[in-house]
UniProtKB/Swiss-Prot annotation:
This is Phosphatidylinositol-3-phosphate phosphatase MTMR7. The gene is MTMR7. It comes from Pongo abelii. SMART domains: PTPc_motif. Keywords: Coiled coil, Cytoplasm, Hydrolase, Lipid metabolism, Membrane, Phosphoprotein. The active site is at C338 (phosphocysteine intermediate).
C-alpha cells in the first residue's frame, strides 16, 4: 500500500473504444492487487477489475479539455482508457501503477496473498492432482529400453531440469555427465514422450557446443543410445527448430548444431522458427491492427499479413506435424533442440505430443502436458511473461503461440478435444495473472526454493473443480477424431489458419457475439440429454405397461376356459348381457376360476388401481393417447356403479387404452 499515492479518484470516465461517446462515469480505486472502476449508474454498479500483474503498459496521454487520458494495455489483450479530471490525480495514478505493475520480488505477487478459503489439506491435494510419475507409467515406462535416472538429484547436473529424468538404458552416468558438459546450459538429451506402439520417442535438449569443429564422444554415445532404444529404426532425426542461418551464426560463438560426420546414423532437419525477439515484434504488430477503431477489411487483412503472426504459427505447426509423422508413420525417434531448449523446443514437443496422443486432448491430459513439457523442463515463465521487473527484451509470447496452435487444431478437429476455447483462454489469463503458483519462476529448482506449493494454490485444482465450464459439447470419446494420431497436411499456404478473435478481441463488446457458439452448443447438448432421459423413462414405463397388458390377456384367456367347478354353463346364451341380469345374484358369481392362482389375480388392474398406482400416467392418459376413457362414464356424464360386466368391459377397454 505504500506505493499507492491516491487510492480513490472520483468522476473518472471509462471510455468505450467501440463507441467513444458512451463513456461510463464512475470512481477509480487502487488496491494492493487490483485497479477497480465502479460505475455510478443508478441502475447497476458495474465493476471492472484489473490485476496489477496483468498490466503490460501504461501510457499517459496529452491533457485535453475533458481531462487527462490514461491508456492501460493488459497482457490478456484488454485495453482500458480512462479520463481523469485532474492532471495531478492522473499523474499519481500513473506513478502508482508503474510501480505496482512491476514488482521487484516474488513475495509481492498476488498468489502469495490470494486466499480461496481452502484448508491446508485441500491445498496439498490440489498440487498432487497432476502427477508426472503416473504420466510416465501411462506411457509404459520404465521398460527394457528406458530407465529412470537420478543423475540430476538435487539439480547437480542441470539446474533447469527436473530431478527425475528418463534416459536410454544404455546411457551410463558417465555418458550423461559428459553429454551435459557439451550442451548449452548443460541441458543434455532426455526423454519427452514415448510412443509405445512402436518404441519411437521424442527427446529434447539444447544446442551442442560444437562450434566449427569441436566434438564430444559422450554426446555422440548419448545419441547412439537413443537410437538403440528404438529397435525398429536404424537412425534418429535431429530437428533444429531454428532457421539455418541463425544456427550457423551460433557456430561463431562456439555453439551451433550437430555435425553429421561425427554423429553416426542421424538425419538433420532445420525447421525455421524465429527467435523470441521476432515473435515479440510480430505480436505487437498484430495487436496494433486489432486496436484500429474502424479498419476496412483490406486494411485489417493487410496488417495481419504484414505482422507475420500466422506464418509463425504455421512454422510451429509444421514442426509438430513433421515430428508426429516421423514417430507414428516412420517409427523413428526424434531429438529436438533450439538454442537453450526451453522455448521453441517446448512448443514443438508439446504440439507433436498433442497430435500423437489423444490423452493430451482431454482436460486433465492437457494439464499434464503443460506440467511436463513447460513447467518441469524449465520454461522461463518469469522472464518470458514479465512477472517481475526485468529486461523487457526477454519477454516473448512463447506459450501464447502454443495455446493458439492448440486452438487452430480445435478448429480443424472440433470433435477431438474434450475441452473448449474457454479452457485455453483461462489458462492464458492465469499465466499472466500470478493468482496461482504454477507459472512462477524459471525452473523447478527456483519453485522448490520459494516453497511455492506450501505458500500458494494450484491452478489445475481450480480448473478441475470447474471442469463443467470447459467441456466441449462436440467431443465424443468413441469418435474417430479422438482415436490415435491427428493427421494434418504440411501444405505451403496459410488458409488453414485463422485469426483468433476470441482471444485477441474478446474484450471488444461490439465485435463479439452475445452468445458464444460453445455456450449455444452446450445448451443444446444439455437439452438433448434431458430429452433423452425423459424418453428413456417413458420407454421404461411403456415396457411395464406392455407387461401388464400381456398378463391381463393371459388372465382373461384363463377366465374364458371351461371351469369344472363353477356350475355355470359356458354357452354364450347362458351369460347375461347386462349388469341388471346379475342383480341380486352378485355374491354367487365367481370373480375368478378356482384354478387361477393368487398371483394372477394381483395382475388384474381396474381403472381405479391404474390411477392409484401411477398418478402421472392416469392424469395425462387422455391427453397423451388422444382416446377418452368412456368405459366408466354414463352418457349423461355420471359414473356407473361397478359390476362384473363393467369390470370385464373395462379390461378390454383398458387393453385398447394401453395399446394406444
Amino acid at each position: 500500500m505504500e506505493h499507492i499515492r491516491t487510492p480513490k479518484v472520483e468522476n473518472v470516465r471509462l471510455v468505450d473504444r467501440v463507441s467513444p461517446k458512451k463513456a461510463a462515469l464512475g470512481t477509480l480505486y487502487l488496491t494492493a492487487t487490483h485497479v477497480i472502476f465502479v460505475e455510478n449508474s443508478p441502475g447497476s454498479r458495474k465493476e471492472t477489475w484489473i490485476l496489477h500483474s496483468q498490466i503490460s503498459t501504461i501510457e499517459k496521454q496529452a491533457t485535453t479539455a475533458t481531462g487527462c487520458p490514461l491508456l492501460i494495455r493488459c497482457k490478456n489483450f484488454q485495453i482500458i482508457q480512462l479520463i481523469i479530471p485532474q492532471e495531478r490525480d492522473c499523474h499519481d495514478v500513473y506513478i502508482s501503477l508503474i510501480r505496482l505493475a512491476r514488482p521487484v520480488k516474488y513475495g509481492e505477487l498476488y498468489c502469495f496473498s490470494f486466499n480461496p478459503m481452502l484448508d491446508k489439506e485441500e491445498r496439498e491435494q490440489g498440487w498432487v492432482l497432476i502427477d508426472l510419475s503416473e504420466e510416465y507409467k501411462r506411457m509404459g515406462l520404465p521398460n527394457h529400453y528406458w530407465q529412470l535416472s537420478d543423475v540430476n538429484r538435487d539439480y547437480r547436473v542441470c539446474d533447469s531440469y527436473p530431478t527425475e529424468l528418463y534416459v536410454p538404458k544404455s546411457a551410463t552416468a558417465h555418458i550423461i555427465v559428459g553429454s551435459s558438459k557439451f550442451r548449452s546450459r548443460r541441458r543434455f538429451p532426455v526423454l519427452s514422450y514415448y510412443y509405445k506402439d512402436n518404441h519411437a520417442s521424442i527427446c529434447r535438449s539444447s544446442q551442442p557446443l560444437s562450434g566449427f569443429s569441436a566434438r564430444c564422444l559422450e554426446d555422440e554415445q548419448m545419441l547412439q543410445a537413443i537410437r538403440k532404444a528404438n529397435p525398429g529404426s536404424d537412425f534418429v532425426y535431429v530437428v533444429d527448430t531454428r532457421p539455418k542461418l541463425n544456427a550457423m551464426a551460433n557456430r561463431a560463438a562456439g555453439k551451433g548444431y550437430e555435425n553429421e560426420d561425427n554423429y553416426s546414423n542421424i538425419k538433420f532437419q532445420f525447421i525455421g522458427i524465429e527467435n523470441i525477439h521476432v515473435m515479440r515484434n510480430s505480436l505487437q504488430k498484430m495487436l496494433e491492427v486489432c486496436e484500429l477503431k474502424s479498419p476496412s477489411m483490406s486494411d485489417f487483412l493487410w496488417g495481419l499479413e504484414n505482422s507475420g503472426w500466422l506464418r509463425h504459427i504455421k512454422a510451429i505447426m509444421d514442426a509438430g506435424i513433421f515430428i508426429a509423422k516421423a514417430v507414428s508413420e516412420e517409427g523413428t525417434s526424434v531429438l529436438v533442440h533450439c538454442s537453450d531448449g526451453w522455448d521453441r523446443t517446448a512448443q514443438v514437443c508439446s504440439v507433436a505430443s498433442l497430435l500423437l496422443d489423444p490423452h493430451y486432448r482431454t482436460l486433465k491430459g492437457f494439464m499434464v502436458l503443460i506440467e511436463k513439457d513447460w513447467i518441469s523442463f524449465g520454461h522461463k515463465f518469469n522472464h518470458r511473461y514479465g512477472n517481475l521487473d526485468g529486461d523487457p527484451k526477454e519477454i516473448s509470447p512463447v506459450i501464447d503461440q502454443f495455446i493458439e496452435c492448440v486452438w487452430q487444431l480445435m478448429e480443424q478437429f472440433p470433435c477431438a478435444f474434450e475441452f473448449n476455447e474457454r479452457f485455453l483462454i483461462h489458462i492464458q489469463h492465469h499465466i499472466y495473472s500470478c493468482q496461482f503458483g504454477n507459472f512462477l519462476c524459471n525452473s523447478q529448482k527456483e519453485r522448490q526454493e520459494l516453497k511455492i506449493q506450501e505458500r500458494t494454490y494450484s491452478l489445475w485444482a481450480h480448473l478441475w473443480k470447474n471442469r463443467a465450464d470447459y467441456l466441449n459439447p462436440l467431443f465424443r470419446a468413441d469418435h474417430s477424431q479422438t482415436q490415435g494420431t491427428l493427421h494434418l497436411p504440411t501444405i505451403p499456404c496459410n488458409f488453414m489458419y485463422k485469426f483468433w478473435s476470441g482471444m485477441y478481441n474478446r474484450f471488444e463488446k461490439g465485435m463479439q457475439p452475445r452468445q458464444s457458439v460453445t455456450d449455444y452448443l452446450m445448451a443444446v447438448k444439455e437439452e438433448t440429454q434431458q430429452l433423452e432421459e425423459e424418453l428413456e423413462a417413458l420407454e421404461e414405463r411403456l415396457e411395464k405397461i406392455q407387461k401388464v397388458q400381456l398378463n391381463c390377456t393371459k388372465v382373461k384367456s384363463k377366465q374364458s376356459e371351461p371351469s369344472k367347478h363353477s356350475g355355470f354353463s359356458t354357452s354364450d346364451n347362458s351369460i347375461a348381457n347386462t349388469p341388471q341380469d346379475y342383480s341380486g345374484n352378485m355374491k354367487s358369481f365367481p370373480s375368478r376360476s378356482p384354478s387361477q392362482g393368487d398371483e394372477d389375480s394381483a395382475l388384474i388392474l381396474t381403472q381405479d388401481n391404474l390411477k392409484s398406482s401411477d398418478p402421472d400416467l392416469s392424469a395425462n392418459s387422455d391427453q397423451e393417447s388422444g382416446v377418452e376413457d368412456l368405459s366408466c362414464r354414463s352418457p349423461s356424464g355420471g359414473e356407473h356403479a361397478p359390476s362384473e360386466d363393467s369390470g370385464k368391459d373395462r379390461d378390454s377397454d383398458e387393453a385398447v387404452f394401453l395399446t394406444a
